Amino acid sequence: ALDRIGDTLGIGGIFRGLRTIPVMLEYCRMMEKVCPDALMLNYTNPMGILTGALQRATNVRVVGLCHSVQVCATNLCMMLGLPSDNLKWQIAGINHQGWLLRISRNGEDLYPEIRRRAQLPENRGKDDVRFELMKRFGYYVTESSEHTSEYVPWFIKAKAPELIDRFQIPLDEYPRRCVAQIEAW
């Protein structure tokens, strides 16, 4: 798989894991001594690599979580031009594979309108990978289209480069984010 974000899979994720696993193992060793029944909530990338390593190498209970969960519903509504106040939502999943199971505003189920707006031409290119998964599975995935395309091999295939254009997957997403972040600083 191509590593568009740079900290998940492939060579970027492997090297980031090699730097981060030893530090996280130290934390887990301390937890084994001080609070052996505690649950570690890991928000650190590479999520899958770290969570798996800690589960295999320690006795600490570890769950991988993604920060996208907290902003998923609000960002989805804002992107589609829906009011984002008074939202109630329910998400289930682990690591970078959370799913927005329910979303409502003032008691009204927003999924029918979200599905309708996701198909509008003006929303083409905004979040095509996630919209495709929503069409196929019925739910919106919490992680960005770029990250999701790293985990789901349907979207980027060496023998089907037209998928990159079809789903408008930016292969330079991580460098673009870094430049924007540096400029903001």
What are these regions (language model features)?
Residues 37-39, 63, 84-88:
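Short secondary-structure capping/junction motifs at helix and strand boundaries
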Residues 51-56, 75-77, 101-103:
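Short acidic, glycine/serine/threonine-rich loops at helix termini
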Residues 10-13, 64, 93:
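Glycine-centered flexibility sites
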Residues 40-44, 64-66, 91:
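A structural signal for short, well-ordered beta-strand segments and their strand-loop junctions
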Residues 78-185:
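Long, compositionally biased stretches enriched for glycine and/or charged residues
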Residues 60-76, 80:
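Acidic, His- and aromatic-enriched active-site or binding-groove loops in soluble protein domains
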Residues 1-58:
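Rossmann-fold NAD(P)-binding glycine/threonine-rich loop
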